[in-house]
Amino acid sequence: MLSKIFVDADSCNFKIIKFLQKFILHNKSKLIVVSNKFFSLEITENVALEVVDNVDSFILNLADRYSLVITRDIFFAKLLLDLGVKVMNDEGRIFDINNINYLYFRSKINFNLKIKIKKYYDEDFNKSRYEKFITNFYSLFFS
């Protein structure tokens, strides 16, 4: 079981953050939502909102192998995986050594070519992403 869950809130779906808040009420872990801007979030004993200038550095300093980080940032995910931290995105994709190098390479090419990828989702797909997140989150949390 994981001791801390960090959320890179600047790129995370708010519905996922709300799910994690409810989940953490029944578990002994700590949810740390990190953002570079303040937003409305119910703070409880197990939930903390940290507003910092550099989200990645803040998480990097506190995360360990008993932590899970939720982020969409592939470059940050690779760095965390190299340190033994569990990482997934808010769509339910679990990052690991089998997929991160390809995703990192692809992101680096897109960045160098200044290619921005926009994703458009319909409501049904959003529901499937949410369900995939929950399923994969449970598998990581309780492993």
Curated annotation (Swiss-Prot):
It comes from the Bacteria. InterPro entries: UPF0178. It holds the Pfam family DUF188. Belongs to the UPF0178 family. HAMAP family: UPF0178. This is UPF0178 protein BB_0029.
